Regions:
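Charged, low-complexity intrinsically disordered terminal segments
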Residues: 2-138, 148-158, 165, 169-461
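Lumenal/extracellular "mature" regions of secretory-pathway glycan-modifying transferases
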Residues: 141-143
């Protein structure tokens, strides 16, 4: 009887906690703040300063994305900084950790920060990560790890993805650090984009802005330092690094960074708040103001989940310019929440004067890019959703260059050709290479059900 009594009270306590956790996780982030325009003012002030000498190239495919990361790490002589939303101990993830281990072995300081929720889900028991963290010159932290007493903090995630070498070169974009985005370790992979930036590192340069931002994230009080542990995985890291050098020796040995990149007029970083808390939509506000500078805007995003404020911003933009969105068709998308929300909200989006290219290409589009006029390109981690606007840390890089803009517009043509264009006037057009894909009935039923069930938590999506 005593045991049953204890179990009964444990069950009650668990039920009370779950009620508390769900209630606070859903309702604490509900009040959405308003932007002050501060980020936009900072951006405008940087435009008036002397432009730093920076060069850029886009990275479009998964093999190049992994190789450029390995090259960047191998080039480091002083320090490597690595920030990512989702690192896993799979093929490409182990390649990256082996390269970081190799850098640390030759005396390079290595700092790694991973989102705490994904770190818990995928790396908490990773011997590879522990072996890397055990190296003398390496420090690994989880951003805002799970806090059972404050469950609402689960909503505030580190969504930045960048890699910096020696404060002079970096890769930044939308790719996570696993086989879905890097290398060719698996067949089904997402479509995404990074940019490589080579800089003189001068005051006011985008790399100096990124370094300042990183330090603010790195020093957040909630972060948890991961304890290293030497094990058989230490030898495995050494062996993997040696194998990488053997396979990619020529590519890793010497890179002419100037030849591999193109000069641009200006590069500037737009960043949201680094704190794990509900955020004012300063980054969204800055992006809207940027889009207002062009008469032709192409917004590439995996999905669209907007509140009334964001819808109104899009509507105001569409009144005086062509505003097109390039996103996944429901039958092509990989995010159930995004797909189900689009099923319900499609007509609302179109009614705002926005035309939508619905991509059907067999691979999920994960690219976050805004092409404005013929000279502005914005690339980074920001999705056109409330999570990016109000909850997560996000980065977008603004590149002023007609050459880069033209190249990225040309890159988008292959996906436009495989799209169904939903016009705001109710019409539909089809790309030259569009092929209809049937959405399985089970998925359609799931998405339809989710579109109703997730209404109470749309602000968290």
């Amino acid at each position: 009887m005593k045991q049953k009594h204890i179990l009964k009270w444990l069950g009650i306590a668990l039920g009370v906690y779950l009620f508390y956790a769900v209630l606070t996780a859903v309702f604490v982030p509900l009040p959405q703040k308003e932007a002050t325009g501060e980020l936009w003012s900072q951006y405008e002030a940087r435009l008036s300063e002397d432009a730093s000498q920076e060069r850029v190239r886009s990275i479009e495919d998964t093999d190049s994305a992994l190789l450029w990361r390995l090259q960047l790490i191998e080039s480091a002589e002083r320090e490597v900084i690595f920030s990512t939303f989702d690192l896993r101990a799979d093929g490409s993830g182990q390649d990256l950790m082996a390269a970081l281990y190799g850098a640390a072995q030759r005396g390079v300081r290595v700092r790694v920060i991973v989102d705490g929720l994904n770190g818990f889900l995928h790396l908490q028991n990773s011997g590879v990560l522990r072996a890397l963290a055990a190296e003398e010159n390496v420090e690994v932290r989880f951003y805002d790890p799970i806090d059972l007493l404050r469950p609402w903090k689960l909503n505030y995630r580190l969504h930045d993805k960048y890699l910096i070498a020696d404060g002079s070169k970096y890769i930044l974009g939308g790719r996570n650090s696993n086989d879905l985005f890097l290398g060719s370790y698996q067949e089904n992979q997402n479509i995404d984009r990074d940019v490589l930036v080579v800089s003189d590192g001068g005051e006011g340069s985008s790399v100096s802005q990124l370094l300042t931002y990183f330090e603010s994230v790195w020093s957040q009080p909630e972060n948890k330092t991961i304890t290293g542990k030497t094990s058989s995985q230490t030898d495995a890291l050494q062996e993997r690094y040696a194998a990488l050098c053997a396979v990619h020796g020529k590519e890793l040995a010497a890179v002419d960074w100037e030849v591999e990149t193109a000069a641009v007029t200006h590069v500037s970083l737009l960043s949201g708040s680094p704190r794990a808390e509900a955020k004012a939509p300063e980054l969204w506000d800055a992006l809207v103001r940027l889009m207002a500078q062009g008469d032709d805007v192409l917004l590439q995003t995996p999905y669209i989940i907007c509140n009334d404020k964001m819808y109104n911003d899009l509507e105001a933009l569409a009144e005086t310019r062509q505003l097109r969105v390039l996103t996944n068709a429901v039958e092509n998308g990989a995010n159930p929440s995004g797909c189900s929300d689009y099923l319900r909200e499609k007509q609302n989006i179109l009614s705002r004067g926005v035309d939508v290219y619905e991509v059907v290409c067999g691979q999920s589009l994960h690219t976050k890019t805004i092409l404005i006029g013929n000279d502005l390109s914005v690339v980074g981690s920001f999705n056109a959703d409330m999570r990016s606007a109000y909850l997560d840390t996000e980065l977008m890089l603004v590149i002023e260059s007609e050459e880069v803009n033209a190249a990225l517009r040309q890159e988008s043509v292959q996906y436009i050709d495989q799209s169904r264009l939903a016009l705001h006037d109710g019409g539909t057009e089809y790309g030259a290479r569009f092929e209809e894909m049937t959405l399985p009935w089970a998925k359609r039923a799931l998405y339809t059900a989710l579109s109703f069930l997730q209404r109470l938590i749309r602000h968290l999506l």
